[in-house]
């Protein structure tokens, strides 16, 4: 049995990844197993930060990357590989900022996932939309981001296209097409490509 497909929904915190993932799950058949970083690790991260005396809203930076993020992403990758090796597709939902902005790192990560078909869906935003969404959801996790918002935007680059091949889903306030319509159009094009080539995909994303 070969490795099943992986769908990666990526983008900055607060950009609307979970919403995009929900729409995508409703359109895919078979339905992938969803691995959402916040669902998997949210309470564990909060406990780790508290025990280490770190700010409760800390979700990035050198300390976080070394002591927390490496284990979050390492765990998600290992579980995704194990699930898809049994023939079940997987949908990963997390920022994956470093992976999507470095082509070599992306290729290496795809291999860690088991290779095969790994499709990146990047949720596009901008600073105005991002601030609005972070303020509206009112999560303690976002306190540090809002306190130094300009620096956060500079790091996250919500409107900068990833290096890795991807499908962009526009979730800015100015978007004229709904998320579901964007996804449907992309999946329809993917299916048409598959039929035209006799069961082979030409599209990179």
Which positions does each model-derived feature cover?
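Small-molecule kinase domains that catalyze NTP-dependent phosphoryl transfer to phosphate-bearing small molecules
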Residues: 136-184, 188-205
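P-loop (Walker A) phosphate-binding loop of NTP-binding proteins
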Residues: 12
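Conserved phosphate-donor/acceptor-positioning beta-strand/loop module used by diverse small-molecule
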Residues: 113-135
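Glycine-rich phosphate-binding loop used to anchor ATP phosphates in small-molecule kinases
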Residues: 64-114
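Conserved substrate/cofactor phosphate-moiety recognition/catalytic segment
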Residues: 22-74, 81
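ATP-binding Walker
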Residues: 15
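Walker A/P-loop
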Residues: 18
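Hydrophobic anchor at the beta1->P-loop junction of P-loop NTPases
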Residues: 9
């Amino acid at each position: 049995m070969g490795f099943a497909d992986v769908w990666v929904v990526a983008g900055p915190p607060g950009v609307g990844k979970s919403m995009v993932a929900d729409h995508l799950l409703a359109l895919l058949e078979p339905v992938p197993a969803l691995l959402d970083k916040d669902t998997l690790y949210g309470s564990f991260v909060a406990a780790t930060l508290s025990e280490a005396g770190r700010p409760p809203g800390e979700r990035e930076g050198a300390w976080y990357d070394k002591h927390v993020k490496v284990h979050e992403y390492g765990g998600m990758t290992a579980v995704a590989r194990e699930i898809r090796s049994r023939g079940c597709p997987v949908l990963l939902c997390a920022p994956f900022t470093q992976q999507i902005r470095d082509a070599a790192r992306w290729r290496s990560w795809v291999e860690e996932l088991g290779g095969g078909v790994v499709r990146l869906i990047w949720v596009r935003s901008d600073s105005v939309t991002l601030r609005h969404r972070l303020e509206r959801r009112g999560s303690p996790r976002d306190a540090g981001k809002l306190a130094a918002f300009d620096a956060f935007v500079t790091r996250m680059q919500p409107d900068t296209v990833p290096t890795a091949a991807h499908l962009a889903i526009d979730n800015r306030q100015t978007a004229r097409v709904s998320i579901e319509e964007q996804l449907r159009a992309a999946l329809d094009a993917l299916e048409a490509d598959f039929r035209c080539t006799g069961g082979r995909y030409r599209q990179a994303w």
